[in-house]
A protein has these predicted regions:
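A gly/ser-rich beta-alpha-beta helix-loop segment of oxidoreductase catalytic cores
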Residues: 1-15
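Glycine-rich phosphate/pyrophosphate-binding beta-alpha loops
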Residues: 3, 28-35, 81, 119-124
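Short glycine/proline-enriched turns and hinge-like loops at secondary-structure junctions
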Residues: 5-8, 33-38, 53-56, 82-84, ...
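A short core secondary-structure module
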Residues: 26-72
């Protein structure tokens, strides 16, 4: 068992049993599931292993207090200002939810995940580019204001090189 950023690698099983789905397996990374406001989790798992790769998974709504959900450990997010933000590893053992908790239909889990993750990647990229631009602005302001050995830092070649390298990166 391994964690993976490939959404098609999820091993948690979602099996239909009459009017319910039964969930069994491990979720290595569950975002915000231990936050105090989390009452319902969106859980993606493999519901049809014989289907084409991108149609094997489904997503179901699972109330956080459903019997059979075990918190294994909280996880930290590297470089996050809000870490730990509620991310955790869970085990699901015979967790039962009504068939009506299926989102969009069986086999639509990957589509749902990509619909959220795709735009999210752009949002994070824009956020970090903005942060980098602000850091560059602050560096330039500081180099212009700070005087060392009778000269502004902005006049020193080594500082100019560092600013230029930062702009290129």
């Amino acid at each position: 068992q391994v964690a993976s950023s490939d959404a098609t690698n999820m091993e948690l099983e979602i099996t239909r049993d009459g009017d319910e789905y039964v969930l069994n397996g491990r979720k290595w990374w569950t975002t915000n599931a231990i936050g105090e406001r989390c009452k319902i989790m969106l859980v993606m798992g493999r519901s049809n292993p014989d289907a084409p790769r991108h149609k094997q998974h489904s997503t179901v709504l699972v109330p956080r207090d459903t019997p059979g959900i075990t918190l294994i450990r909280p996880l930290r997010v590297f470089d996050s200002f809000h870490s730990p933000g509620g991310e955790a590893e869970f085990v699901f053992e015979n967790v039962r939810v009504p068939v009506s908790n299926m989102i969009k239909g069986e086999g639509c889990g990957f589509e749902i995940a990509q619909g959220r993750l795709g735009p999210g990647r752009f949002q994070y990229a824009m956020m970090f580019v903005g942060m980098a631009q602000r850091c560059l602005e602050l560096m330039c302001e500081r180099a212009e204001q700070r005087v060392a050995f009778g000269e502004k830092l902005s006049k020193k070649t080594s500082v100019q090189h560092e600013i230029a390298r930062s702009r290129c990166d």
